Every structure is written in C-alpha cells, then in structure tokens.
Amino acid sequence: MKFVDEASILVVAGDGGNGCVSFRREKYIPKGGPDGGDGGDGGDVWMEADENLNTLIDYRFEKSFRAERGQNGASRDCTGKRGKDVTIKVPVGTRVIDQGTGETMGDMTKHGQRLLVAKGGWHGLGNTRFKSSVNRTPRQKTNGTPGDKRELLLELMLLADVGMLGMPNAGKSTFIRAVSAAKPKVADYPFTTLVPSLGVVRMDNEKSFVVADIPGLIEGAAEGAGLGIRFLKHLERCRVLLHLIDIDPIDGTDPVENARIIISELEKYSQDLATKPRWLVFNKIDLLDKVEAEEKAKAIAEALGWEDKYYLISAASGLGVKDLCWDVMTFIIENPVVQAEEAKQPEKVEFMWDDYHRQQLEEIAEEDDEDWDDDWDEDDEEGVEFIYKR
C-alpha cells in the first residue's frame, strides 16, 4: 500500500436541535400548560488511534466528515434524539493540527486513544423551560447552537527508538536490512529510499528496539532540494539518532563536509531535533584496510570537533554491527521513554459555554419580571412565538 503521511480533512460536528413551542391539549384539562420539549445535542467528531493502520491514504480521497444533527424537540415534553457521533480512525503516531489556528490538538500515540476534534452544538430549550409564576403560557424557545467546524491537518509520524541519518547512499537501508527483517530497496544510485521504513532489531527473546530509515538528505534540503526535509518529522520521537557517514565516498566528496551538511539541515528543520542524542557511525570500512579506516575516521571526527565515542562498521559485511546494536540497546534500556502527559481534551469549544441555558433562562426571567403587570390572557392561543438566539 502506498505510504501517505499527510492529509487534510474537514470535520463538522452536528448542530443542536431546536426547542419546541407546544401546549398540552387534553379533554377535561382546560389549562394544560406548556409541554414543548428540548432539542437534542449535535453529534461530536472523534479521532481514534488504530495500530492496524499504517498510512493516511484513505483520507486523500475521503476528506469530509460530518456528525449527525440533533433532532428538534416535540410536544408532550419529548426531547429530541442526540445526533450520532463520527469516529475517524488514524494510525498510531498521527498528529492532529488545526489549520485555522496552527494549534496542535493532540498526538495519537497509543492504540485506542481518542481525541475530540469537533464538539456538537448545544440543544435548544422548549417552552416548558420558560414557564414561571408570571408567565404561565410561554411562547419562547431557543434554537440549538451550530456544531464546531474545523479544517485539520493529519501528520503521521513513525514511532521508533532509533532514527537513521545520512547522505544518499551512506548505507542506511543496507544497515536496516542487516539488523532487522525489513527489506528496503538497496541500489547504487542516490535516493533509492523514497519513503520511510521501520525495522525491528531483536537482540534476544526479551530485548528489541525499532529503527527508522528515512530518505537521505542533501545540501539545500530545507529549501526543497532532493526529497526535502519533510521526512525528518519521523525522527522527532526517536530517542537516539545514528548519523551514518560513508568513510570513503565513491563520488569523491568530502566526508567532513557531508556530515556538516546533515547537521546544518537538522538545525534548519528543528532545534529540538538537532539537540537529540546523535551517534557518529562510519560505514563501509570494508573498502579500506583496518589501520587506514581507523586513521581516516579519527581525522574526520577531529575535523567535526567530535569528542564522544564513534563507531566503525560495515553494514554489508556485518563488521562492527552487532557491537553497535548492543550499545544502542543498552542506551535505550538506561534511558526509558518519559511518558508525556496525555493532552487534556478541551471541555469547551470556543463558541460553546457551559452556562448557555442558564443565561437564556435568566434573560427570560428578567423580561418577565419587567412585564409582570402587563395585560395578558392565559387562553390566548394566537400569540407570537418568540425565538431567542445567542
């Protein structure tokens, strides 16, 4: 299936149902009084994370999701039925962004996690709600409020422990093939990898980690050169980055300059990503003899001002790969993921307020108090129906 990691959709919650103006008419009950029921609340729109999905391709074709409107109230104090909710299932790792405000509404990081993205409208009040000691035959009601409407950007971000960085043809895909069962395409030309891929590295029956391979970066990627830097977002949740450097590039480029290009593009994309733990890994040492490879790696590290440990491996032959993987496993065990607090669901939507109905009733009561001595007829059935809007 085609890998799609971005999609824009429209979500519209249901409007609230209107209240009803009605009076009880029954034999032998001359003054039945008001019996208009309230409307039903509008349906909500929810996001739900599903671990069985791995792409957003479905939302390239289906872009609009609308919840059901609440039914209007009816006579005999019948309340309208609440509108049905709509649930949109997305892959685990999806970030939901409100395109109107640029606000991140939530990150779907766990299977079954739900996120409210559009709140349904409040129900309107029937005329029964407006009955008082001075207004026995109210002809007032309120309409339901509109449901929330948002344009959302969905961004799928892979969940991995380790991320691979490097220029095209640095050997990232060869490495992930060597340490996991993943089989990304490998060839001797740049940009063989076009989409991110995941591989599970199993060290033993109880220890494993997930590694993410993304397309290579080149100079100017931040400005859109090559495949750009859009895939770097898949590394944001990684705990450590493996920066693969081709120790002896076949195209004759300078490994030091290549490494600096990667660092520069990281900083242009995100300072947070640039400050993540990053390990220097020199690949393709099988092309040189051992002493020459060690001397060249040391010279490159010094030129980069690298003072931490670095690794020499050959992904093709497996030389040094196992030791690197065990060190990564140890790092992951010693640095467990700090569970971020789940984003709190907003209890209100901007145009909603919890005391909406209370305010409506207070306003009607004030008007009734002002007009308490006006002439009015309880049996007048031809009066005007009042609709209060907010």
From Swiss-Prot:
Indicate whether Cell inner membrane appears among the record's keywords: no
Q: Which cofactor does it need?
A: Mg(2+)
Q: What happens when the gene is disrupted?
A: Essential for growth, it cannot be disrupted.
Recorded hits in CDD domains, A to Z, give:
Obg
Q: Which residues bind GTP?
A: 166-173, 191-195, 213-216, 283-286, 314-316
Effect of mutating S173N: No effect on persister cell formation upon overexpression
Q: What Gene3D superfamilies is this protein classified in?
A: GTP1/OBG domain (2.70.210.12), P-loop containing nucleotide triphosphate hydrolases (3.40.50.300)
Question: According to the UniProt record, where is the region Not essential, but deletion increases sensitivity to DNA replication inhibitor hydroxyurea (HU)?
Answer: 360-390
| GO BP of this protein | chromosome segregation; dormancy process; negative regulation of ribosome biogenesis; ribosomal large subunit assembly; ribosome assembly
Kindly report the protein's main subcellular placement as a broad class: cytoplasm
Q: Which effect does the record note for changing R237C?
A: Increased sensitivity to HU upon overexpression, supports normal growth, no effect in mazEF/relBE or tonB deletions
Top enzyme class, one word, equals: hydrolase
**Which spans does this entry mark as compositional bias, Polar residues?**
129-145
Copy the domain comment.
The C-terminus (residues 341-390) is not required for either 50S ribosome subunit association nor 70S ribosome dissociation.
Q: Which NCBIfam families match?
A: Obg_CgtA (TIGR02729), PRK12297.1 (NF008955), PRK12299.1 (NF008956)
What's the family? Answer: Belongs to the TRAFAC class OBG-HflX-like GTPase superfamily. OBG GTPase family.
The identity of this protein, by name, is: GTPase ObgE/CgtA
